[in-house]
Amino acid sequence: MQWQDQAWSKDLWYSGKVDRRRFLGLSAAAGAVGASMLVPPPWRDAFGQTRPYKIGALQPLTGAAASGGRMALIGTELAVRRINASGGINGRPVELVVEDDQSMPDAGRRKAEKLATTDRIDAHQGGWLSDVCLACMKVWENHGIVNMIGVCLDPRITTTRCSRYSFRPFDYAPAQAVAFAPSLIKMAKRWHIVYADYTWGQSTRDSFANEIKWHGGEVVGTTTIPVGTADMTPLLSKIGGRFEGLFGILYGADAITFAIQAHDLGLTRKYRWAGEGSIAISMNLPRLGAKIEGFVGIDRYLPVFESTLDTPYHRKWFAEFIEMTKKSAPGTVAPDRYVQSNYEAMNFLRIGMQRSGFRGRADTQKLIEALEDLEVHAGDDFPQGDKKLRKEDHQAFTDQFIFEMRSGRHRILTRVPWSETVQPPACRFA
């Protein structure tokens, strides 16, 4: 089934959306005929024939990362709805041009090229899997398109592979590791890391291993999990030895499989278990049930009203998400970090376009300059909190929340301010 035919996408609007209901008409040559009609943009009445900004949104809507890609796209759509409802950007509406990268780098590169050449987008906001983001960065650069990333965490995006055209307005693994390592060492001195065998998992493994060692701990072993492994038992059953902590770095269906099978093997009771927050995102919780109990994680966003997340603007944004998704997702899950980061990324892009007087690709350099060192504050557009897009590498830093799963809910143990997670820039723009 194509992503456009799935229930979650029914209430979204994107360029080229078709009403697939069949309309009947009469013809002298043929009897009743079926037809499909383009769904008009919801902003047409307000903006008339004003030329919209075309913003590309490349996400994994099928394949291994599809569940996360859907949440990411919902975050972008939520921001675009609010932008258009409040007058657009520079008096022009925003039109989303959505493409599915199928969770594969080669497909992502082809779709990025299509967005750049066929669809002629003005800017791009999206990207979920790090290997896809890395594969597409040269496309955006070659066509002079600003790329505001929504999810990808691989450190190379803003370090050794950085680009003047790409921005990451949220955290990355080195910042997470700096924030979490002191707590991990209190839980256990010796750790075994289980990680997804692709760029994000590998780089996150390295970041946490380095920080654990720097704080006097030790990583005594690692277990590599190929993406899409349905039965991890043969791999997990080999885990043993002298260590006290089990650390997981997985996402999507693999995160669910890991948590369930590690629990069933007794690993999560034998060892203190912790991990990257993607294991315990809200969409995973219904399937994990009680088996996620006691998990300690770190994330930039949690769907709770605690600590600095207990604000009127977070509650308002949370309610807007629930209202937007309740028709297509009965028993709606709460928003997660993928919704949050794409929502805020689109708002970063909006502010940059407004401040630069951006009209289209010819103004890309002006847009880049407006985004560099752009500082934003917590509010309706940035419910997660304050942050700044650093000029030197186009990297932002965010507050980090260390949490424990109790009775199926995230409970914040401590908040680490973004200022305590800052890493020195390691980027040299070409």
Give the predicted meaning of each segment.
Residues 324-339, 350-412, 427:
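Segments of small-molecule ligand-sensing domains
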Residues 110, 155-156, 163-265, 308-315:
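Extracellular/periplasmic Venus flytrap/periplasmic-binding protein
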Residues 67-72, 89-159, 169, 225-232, ...:
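Beta-alpha junction/loop-to-helix N-cap segments that form part of ligand/metal-binding clefts
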Residues 16-17, 38-64:
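C-terminal segment of N-terminal export signals and the immediately downstream linker at the start
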Residues 1-22, 36:
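N-terminal secretory signal peptides
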Residues 115, 120-128, 148-150, 192-195, ...:
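Periplasmic-binding protein-like
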Residues 262-343, 356-358, 415-429:
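Extracellular/periplasmic periplasmic-binding protein-like sensory domains
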Residues 56-77, 99-105, 128-129, 196-201, ...:
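Extracytoplasmic "Venus flytrap"
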